[in-house]
Amino acid sequence: MLTRREMIGSLGALPAASLLGPGRLYAEAVSELPRRTLGRTGRQVVPLALGGSASLSHPSEGLDAADIIVRAVQLGINYLDTANAYGPSQVIYGDAFRRLHLTPTDPDYNLPLRQSLYVNSKTSARYAAHPNPPQGWEPGPPRLAINDLKRTLTQLFGDGKGYIPEGAYLDCVQIHNMSRMEDVDQVYEGFAARGSFDRPERIGTIAGLLDYRDGTNYTGLNPEHRVWVRHIGITGHASSPILMRAVRLDEQDILDTVLMALNANDRLYGSNQNNILPLAVARGMGVIAMKIFADGAMYGAPKHSLTSAKDVILSVGKPGAISPKDLIRYPLALPGVTCAVVGIGRIDRHRPEADQLVANLAAAVSDMPSELERRRIEKETAERQGADTNFFQEKRADIVQPTSIQAKKDSERVIVEWNTALAGPEPIRSYEIRVGQRIVMSLPYRPQLTEAPLRAFLPASEVGEEAITVVASTAAPREKA
């Protein structure tokens, strides 16, 4: 068995000319890359995923950006990410896929390689059909989800002009950047009317994509019964509560993946790791971490979304800054995280130590930090890089206590219902049910899986006429006081 040093050394030495690798050592190295299960998709993916932004969305002049994708596939990375919102990223993927013989019309089409990859794109559209689509967060004309799906397929596997070859498909399409509660309402609009004779004019993205996942035509948007999508997911970096509501509304387990911001400063903000992450894991979703370097802000990039090639970080880390190895290992050590999507600014086939792909992959397959070491990484990140890196994420200082608390008498018992609390920097470990000032029940925390409220049952004899409250606590459950 190869040591990690031998494995990364052999991968880092892979030349540009060899698309199949230089022999036994390379094949052994790729086969030994660890893989994790992407939730209920059942797919096995390497813990480092290739992001579709950075030099793929903002390539510098003269850069062969497609070679970044070729290099990633050569190194054994099999989760590949892009988006309709990422400028030329999808077109660059198409160039790389032609070099790798991944287009179905290629006489040398490499079907086994295609089947080993998990190709994911995103749509910012909230509707699949709408007579007057609302303007979304993405610049330009309003978008519709099925148009974005077709655009992705033609750019990745077709001619980029509308032609989609037979056999083309995406492993996943994610609804991009869910950042408002209104987004959640819109993407679910018309879902309940799927298959009805009176089709609504406005059909949300979920219902539209579901037809292209299942080969159905309940929305009237898939008359040829195409099966172009294997899985559907969501993404978001601004707010855990928004993603949590989208997941809770999904009572049919349609949403298989969630891409969320998870970096070493996460607990200084909305603490996705203590809110949406445990819910997604409980629902069996595949969890992908993003914003590992905070769009480069960890290494001096402006604290805003990437707008030009000059903002792309090209080095492996930065002198005096926290190690990129630590930043990558941090989210991958969180329970339930499958992989981390990281954009690449630069590769170097001649100097592996300067190759971001090699460095990031080496970090992703190294030993994971303990909880104590994660706290060290958090402290060092805040001290060296500052606590203000996550410009894209809401701040929340402490627990938001449960809402909609109700108590209903049912014969000899009282049913207590409430909607979930939101955690701050520390995870919620218990719910305390209080009658007046007395704690009458202490329950282990559990995520609220659907819109149905959380419940507990009390003997009516313990309640009397005093008010009932539910309090979230970071302490472990305790015995009745």
Which stretches of residues belong to each language-model region?
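Active-site mouth loops of central-metabolism enzymes
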Residues: 53-62, 131-144, 313-318
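Conserved aromatic anchor
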Residues: 414-425
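Structured C-terminal cap/extension of enzyme domains
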Residues: 251-254, 271-406, 411
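N-terminal binding-site loop/beta-alpha segment at the start of enzyme catalytic domains
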Residues: 2-118
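Recognizes extended acidic, P/S/T-rich segments that occur
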Residues: 430-464
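Hydrophobic faces of well-ordered beta-strands that scaffold small-molecule active sites
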Residues: 46-50, 80, 119-121, 173, ...
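Beta-strand-rich modules
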Residues: 459-477
